[in-house]
Amino acid sequence: MIKLLEWLGDPLGMLESSSDMVAYAETLRTKSVHKSITGILITADYTVCRDVLKSPNWRTRPEANNIFEKLYLGSIADSEKIDPFLESIIAKDGDEHSRIRKLIQPAFTFRVMQNWRMSAERIAKELVNQIESQSEIDFVASLANPLPLAMICEILGVPLADRETFTSWGRTLAIIGLDLPRTTKENQELEKASDELTNYIAHLLAERKRSPREDLLSILANVESEGDTLTDREIIATASFLLIAGFETTVNLLSVGTWVLLENRDQLKQITMNHDLVPNLVEEALRVVSPVQYTARTAGSDLELADGTNVRRGQTIVLVLAGANRDPAIFDNPNEFQLRRENARKHVAFGYGAHHCIGAQLARLEAEMLWRELLLRFPDVESWKHAGTPMWRPGKTIKGLDSMPIHLGKKK
């Protein structure tokens, strides 16, 4: 069916056939909003994307209203099993979303973030310290994967012996679960990984209730607001989705962000002369990389978009975030990587409004700590070079690298 849509030149078919979301987004610049023959709307317009993301009239949980949408969005069935995608805060709207966000907020306070910052700094130092001078490494395997993995496992209190298995579940859920449409085999893999992950976290949660520790599960198990608490299902779904979203997207921010730096050597030289630019690097990398390439929302009522497009209740819109983050109406010379871009933080890489990613600050500090440590220990950036061909990961929703061999030069 998707092949037919592609043959017809339908924007949804073109989306599914595209391997480059930035190039695809450029084909959408002819107007703010395009409509597929399936009824699905598609946009790469920054203003439309931002307005949809912040509006309470749009729901995060999609609806399959016809055979075309069912093929693309997937069928949604209620189950006794815990679904990390449909039961976490990311899929909640309105009062339900506000309630859960209020309850999990104690897990993301300034004090907690400061502790996480110290952990990220310590882990980044340990990882960079393991790299030998004048050696070649796979940046993904040596740095981009281990840092967020260690951080999330530490935050959740996952024992060292279980971390590889734990992460494999998260990667399966992120790579397959965030891409649609899926094959029958992919759905089976997804269900297996989801069951194993949620069962494992349920076991950890039961342990934390018996013996609380200084970790996220213990905090979530004991939060209370006006007599309200989180259910076990909500805690398990929240922790599961933190792994899915917090691990894979951060890996890709780190790896693809470093790839972008290597492709923009003038910017790399600037940052080695002024490490105060590292926070700017994080924001511009988020804008250019857009780890989550696109997302979708479903209208909760009949409404009108910023460009005047009329939308019926239940209609779905695909928001091409990779395109919104390069909208020339917002960002001057949007395809250029500029460390000193003044409005880089306007990006929508972490969403916008009520559904702005609650773990955004964690991803930012992980990236900042790793890049700072690399610049300190390997200051000769002239020696930073590709040592082989980067291998890009298949999949459209999440942009990332499977491997990236690099040479970092002499170690200080």
Feature locations, PLM:
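Cytochrome P450
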Residues: 1-412
